[in-house]
Amino acid sequence: MSKVQEVLDIVKEMSVLELSELVEAMEEEFGVSAAAPAPAAAPAAGGDQGGAEAAEQTEFDVVLNDAGQKKIQVIKAVKEATGMGLKEAKALADELPKAVKEKVSKEEAEELKEKIEEAGGDVEIK
């Protein structure tokens, strides 16, 4: 068994408290932060419109607005499409609206939207 697989197996067996302590220890040991990077500021509306066309958006966020009547199917679709664990997918579906995936290509965003809508969710691409 590879070292990576051994570490993954150990992490799978840890409690949430132990995982939190692990993250803190890694932050201290390696001098990094596990916090998500701050989003880039959006350009001001009504800016330079002097004949220059706005650049076409290349990264999209897929936002789940409502899980609908088939919440379990939506959670399963989110879990399968994102690789999240069941607990994370359920937490996402409980705190709506919430981004399912961020900064993905238009094609990936459309595929994800279609899968979640087929399961009964209300999805928006931003």
UniProtKB/Swiss-Prot annotation:
Q: Where is this region: Disordered?
A: 36-57
Keyword Chloroplast appears in the UniProt entry: no
Q: Which GO terms describe its cellular component?
A: cytosolic large ribosomal subunit
Low complexity: compositionally biased ranges: 36-55
Q: Please provide the Gene Ontology terms (biological process) for this protein.
A: translation
Q: Mind listing the UniProt keywords for this protein, alphabetically?
A: Ribonucleoprotein, Ribosomal protein
Signal sequence bounds: none
Q: Would the keyword Secreted turn up in this protein's UniProt record?
A: no
Q: What domain of life is recorded for the organism?
A: Bacteria
Gene3D superfamilies tied to this protein: 3.30.1390.10, Single helix bin
Task: Give any GO molecular function from the UniProt entry.
Answer: structural constituent of ribosome
Family, as annotated: Belongs to the bacterial ribosomal protein bL12 family.
Record's NCBIfam families? Answer: L12
Task performed by this protein:
Forms part of the ribosomal stalk which helps the ribosome interact with GTP-bound translation factors. Is thus essential for accurate translation.
According to the record's subunit comment, the protein's assembly and interactions are: Homodimer. Part of the ribosomal stalk of the 50S ribosomal subunit. Forms a multimeric L10(L12)X complex, where L10 forms an elongated spine to which 2 to 4 L12 dimers bind in a sequential fashion. Binds GTP-bound translation factors.
**What's this protein's name?**
Large ribosomal subunit protein bL12
